[in-house]
Amino acid sequence: MVENVIWPAYFDAALSRRDGRRVPMELAVEEPSIDEIATAVQQVGYDAVVERDVAYPRRHWDAAGRVLVKDADDAKNTLVQAVAAYVGALRD
């Protein structure tokens, strides 16, 4: 079973690529929540499991949580880009 981990830092417009952002600034949002990300993952068509009390290793002081994506067929980068597009659409 393939399990991808998606951290809110991947979509945070306040972070640089060096600090963990994985999407272009055009797709990034301010302070993404794991609930928004989980909703976007479900919109893309995958099952999402939210873990709230874990911290992204590069930001170990900020336990923002993470979203686990079960059985994703796509490459992780493709999945992250699709989720970023939906998170942006949810904000509009």
Curated annotation (Swiss-Prot):
It comes from the Archaea. GO terms for biological process: SRP-dependent cotranslational protein targeting to membrane, signal sequence recognition. Coiled coil: none annotated. Its main location: cytoplasm. Part of the signal recognition particle protein translocation system, which is composed of SRP and FtsY. Archaeal SRP consists of a 7S RNA molecule of 300 nucleotides and two protein subunits: SRP54 and SRP19. Involved in targeting and insertion of nascent membrane proteins into the cytoplasmic membrane. Binds directly to 7S RNA and mediates binding of the 54 kDa subunit of the SRP. This is Signal recognition particle 19 kDa protein. It comes from Halobacterium salinarum (strain ATCC 700922 / JCM 11081 / NRC-1). The lineage of its organism: Archaea, Methanobacteriati, Methanobacteriota, Stenosarchaea group, Halobacteria.
